[in-house]
Amino acid sequence: MFFHAILVLIQVALALGASPRAGSSERSKYFVTSLPGMYSNLPKEEIPIMFSGQLELFPENNTHYYFWKFVNPNPIAEAERRTIFWLNGGPGCSSMDGALMEAGPFRVNDDKEIVYNNGSWHKAGDIVFVDQPAGTGFSYSDEYEHELPDVSVHFLKFLEKYFEVFPEDRQNQIFFAGESYAGQYIPYIADGILKRNKNLKAGESPYDLRGLLIGNGWIAPNEQSLSYVQYALQAGFVSPSMPGWSRLLASQERCQNVVNSVNTQDDSVSDYKVVSDVCDQVLNTLLEVARDRDAPADQQCVNMYDYTLRDEFPSCGMNWPPDLVNVKPFLNIPGVQSQLNLVHKKPWLECSGRVGRNFVAQRSKPAVHLLPSLLEDVPILLFNGNRDIICNYIGTEAFIKELEWNGQKGWDDDNVFDWNFDGNLAGYVRNSRNLTFVNVFNSSHMVPFDLPDTSRSLMDLVTGNFDIKDDKILTYKLGTRGQAKQSDKKPASTSSIPSEISATALASGSSSASAQASATANEADGDNNTSHKIERAIQLLVIIVLLWGIYALYSSYKSRPSSIIKSGPTGKKKNVQWADQLRRFQEDDQVRVQPHGIFAKALNKFKGNSDGAYAPVQGRYEDIEMSSASPIDDFVVVSDDEEEEPSRNEPSSNQK
């Protein structure tokens, strides 16, 4: 065990010594060297280099964003010089869902220890999970964000601070990935980056933004709400013969009237904000109509995040995914919070009710309005798990059909291409003019939760790391593309594929800003390398001496005679308490503790009230990343520092 730990420390030391620029000493306080189960459950070669902590953004209002960065110590060539920023949704749901249940290298077992996720995205590039807006997860502030433009401004500030700590990442290709309400966050952040790149201040260099990946995104909420009835009929869990069918159609018609009155291409802010309460009600009505009152109590409602699963009514998916019952207590272990370098320790809640209630998005236009301008410069990949109801693939394809970008409306043609991953059919792909859509088969609202290895290959579709054969798009397990027989494969090229399905089309960063970013960053990097050789050598020498000293001390300790009378442990027992583990959407006011050709169905949606949060069904359903918002009266403040956590079936204002 000791030598295992030393090996990890050496890997971290080499990572530091590789580029001792200005940020190196600063970032040392963010190292993560141990977590429960790390040395006993993970192969030593799979232990990532990790950095974690709370970065100060605005001292005037005490705003700090929490991040957890994972680096592959042995990266393959195709994954080098990449940084992926991952965001979960809500608003107000922690990206630790993504880190510990989806795209990160760890899962949490029943013993509250980490185990390895073989499909981790950190093998496709360094990945950084960020809790935002302020107040989400381990992030904190004295003030809350209210609008989507705030998200953009504050995240650009986070990037500024992040690159001060990790200057070697500044030249990397940047990708954003996330799901659910991140379908609003990511376009706004990308828009802010592109505007920054075009208006650089003295001494600034552009960020090399290369692609956006949005899974089960809540991008055009009202238009997507119109897909529920069609999806449910196709999936077979409702029919016109059901009681309440006419009520469902009436709800659908009211939403259609809203959509007809709002031009999604209109650049002005809609009276309906990001989502209309009228359209928000369609899903609530659908789940009520689909309820099977003759089934056992825990099987009466279809799971809104995976229609093949059942749940109790009115939860309808709030008790999913099952991993959450381990993730929450794990992140609330005091020792784990210390190992993650939390200066301001706080109870971890999956979703913050206070953030959701404050994030009203009342003056924000839906992110779908930003896609046309973004697609002029940046490739965007939208992917949907085909079993998701709340943000289903039918709704995504419907708003794309009505979208006008790069001089044309909708897709160039009707061609659909099968996507094969590792020799098996994984879904289908459509692509035109920098926009790619992927329907991922056999997956839910959280695609990486169900199919981690397959989901990681979505990065290959964005970066052009694929082949074409018989009008099929072929991707492979990490690093194995070169092993495939090339004689019977056609390389991805514009001329070989209709509908612009090609490596060039999918991976192109057509923006001159991206090219400029690469050139500028590389030039700056070249100037730094020579001047730091001596510093690197000295730093590595010091690290080696320190490690040798630790080894010598350990050897001396092991070799000395031991007494037959051994003292027992004297450490204090730490008592940790947390609320009902199945509660999906809890109030984060508890946070202010001590300073602390084939069809399927898919995608998750966030529900919202007049305050801008997406509410659960009947005002009582909590969405994983889009729960419904309850009236403020539902949240009773017990004290200035702690807000009462609602019981499992009470309404909540957050989603994941």
Curated annotation (Swiss-Prot):
It is a single-pass type I membrane protein. Its EC number is 3.4.16.6. Residues 1-17 form the signal peptide. GO terms for biological process: apoptotic process; proteolysis. Residues 18-536 are lumenal. Pfam families: Peptidase_S10. Keywords: Apoptosis, Carboxypeptidase, Glycoprotein, Golgi apparatus, Hydrolase, Membrane, Protease, Signal, Transmembrane, Transmembrane helix. The active site is at S180, D388, H445. InterPro entries: AB_hydrolase_fold (IPR029058), Peptidase_S10 (IPR001563), Ser_caboxypep_his_AS (IPR033124). It comes from the Eukaryota. Residues 626-656 are annotated as: Disordered. This is Pheromone-processing carboxypeptidase KEX1. It comes from Meyerozyma guilliermondii (strain ATCC 6260 / CBS 566 / DSM 6381 / JCM 1539 / NBRC 10279 / NRRL Y-324) (Yeast).
